[in-house]
């Protein structure tokens, strides 16, 4: 509230200190077993559950640990390396007989079911509950909502500070950093607080279901849709690997032929002779010089963000009415985009069964339609190109 913000700025509200009493972690099998036994004995109405993984897809990664809270006052992070058969059996019973609260259930359930075979007959999703009241894309993440709706906002900062320092010290970029590089003592507080905050968000958001219309949408569309899309993602999208490889080769042949056609244009040959180097069709600087300075085409007036004359598709299409070079460049770009964006991207990401497993999202649009993201946005596949078909 406004009053709380003012009070915090004035120093009247102290920072919440997160310690072992609130967020604990264990790599000890007996400590983990005792906590799970206590949860089973308590027979809670619901349990918040989260996973930490070293990948975004169950087939491409494994689970590092799980975090749980059944009070909202404290949580635990358990390293999966300390699991034994008894712990897995007890967790299976706990999840099967308790309402389980996730934040982004589709992600977590996929890992739990794929790697452990756990079942979740009764689950809820705080991310989808929030989407019910705010359909704008973005802003549904656990960290953003925890900052807004719980006393524990920014609990992830120490861990992300460590990650930034580690990447700088070891020369790693975001793509090369793996979640399992994070030491247990750094991870445990962050992970346990994920579960605590998920629990607290559910306590706040579950009141949304007092509205019968919103409850119907949630119970009959969002939750069943979450399960359906999780299964669809697990099934994957089938591709014929051999046909993709053939198409990749055909497209490269088309690109090479289009480039050769461009290099045969007299104006391009003369430009290369004058410049003393080969013309690179991917260089916008060379392209501007060729089109506007050497050939003498009139700029359309459209500018880039830096104020230079634009050579985007719209401009090339317009200039193509006056000269062949813009048409040839546009043709090369279109073919290269299809090859680079789709064919080159799909083939290395196919699983052994020749299926691509990407994401389908319920909460990604304001209109309520599905969206796709991840390895490949399936909604952006061009429909009219014969090679793609």
Regions found by a protein language model. Name each.
Residues 1-80, 137, 148-150, 158-386:
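Conserved "right-hand" nucleotidyltransferase catalytic core of DNA-directed polymerases
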Residues 34-39, 84-98:
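Short, basic/hydrophobic alpha-helical segments
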Residues 48, 98-105:
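Acidic beta-strand-to-loop metal/phosphate-binding motif
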Residues 53-55, 106-107, 128:
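Short, glycine/acidic-enriched loop or turn micro-motifs at the edges of active sites
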Residues 75-77, 100, 121-125:
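Conserved beta-strand scaffold positions in the cores of enzyme catalytic domains, especially
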Residues 95-100, 276-278:
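Short active-site oxyanion
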Residues 108-114, 290:
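Phosphate- and divalent-cation-binding pockets in alpha/beta enzyme and binding domains
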Residues 118-135, 141-147:
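Conserved beta-strand -> loop -> alpha-helix junction used to position metal-binding or nucleic-acid-contacting
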């Amino acid at each position: 509230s406004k009053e709380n913000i003012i009070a915090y700025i004035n120093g009247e509200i102290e920072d919440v200190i997160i310690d072992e009493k609130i967020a604990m972690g264990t790599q000890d099998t007996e400590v983990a077993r005792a906590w799970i036994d206590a949860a089973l004995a308590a027979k809670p109405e619901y349990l918040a559950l989260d996973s930490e993984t070293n990948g975004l897809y169950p087939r491409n990664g494994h689970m590092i640990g799980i975090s749980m809270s059944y009070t909202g006052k404290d949580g635990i992070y358990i390293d999966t390396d300390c699991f034994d058969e008894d712990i897995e059996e007890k967790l299976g019973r706990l999840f099967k007989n308790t309402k389980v609260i996730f934040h982004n259930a589709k992600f977590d359930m996929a890992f739990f079911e794929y790697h452990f075979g756990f079942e979740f007959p009764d689950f809820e999703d705080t991310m989808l509950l929030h989407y019910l009241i705010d359909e704008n894309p973005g802003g549904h993440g656990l960290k953003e909502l925890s900052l807004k709706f719980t006393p524990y906002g920014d609990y992830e900062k120490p861990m992300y500070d460590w990650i930034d320092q580690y990447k700088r010290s070891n020369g790693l970029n975001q793509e090369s950093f793996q979640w399992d590089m994070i030491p247990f003592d750094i991870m445990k507080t962050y992970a346990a607080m994920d579960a605590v905050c998920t629990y607290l968000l559910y306590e706040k958001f579950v009141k949304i279901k007092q509205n019968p219309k919103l409850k119907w949408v949630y119970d009959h569309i969002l939750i069943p849709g979450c399960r359906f899309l999780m299964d669809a993602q697990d099934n994957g999208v089938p591709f014929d690997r051999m046909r993709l490889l053939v198409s990749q080769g055909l497209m490269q042949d088309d690109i090479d032929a289009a480039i050769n056609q461009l290099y045969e244009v007299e104006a391009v040959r003369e430009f290369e002779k004058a410049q003393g180097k080969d013309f690179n069709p991917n260089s916008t600087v060379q392209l501007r010089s060729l089109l506007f300075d050497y050939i003498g085409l009139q700029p359309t007036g459209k500018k880039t963000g830096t104020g230079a004359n634009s050579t985007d598709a719209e401009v090339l299409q317009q200039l193509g009415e006056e000269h062949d070079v813009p048409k040839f460049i546009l043709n090369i770009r279109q073919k290269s985009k299809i090859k680079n964006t789709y064919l080159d991207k799909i083939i290395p990401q196919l699983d052994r069964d020749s299926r691509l497993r990407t994401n389908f999202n319920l909460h990604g649009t304001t209109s309520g339609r599905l969206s796709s993201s991840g390895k490949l946005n399936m909604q952006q596949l061009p429909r009219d190109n014969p090679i793609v078909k």
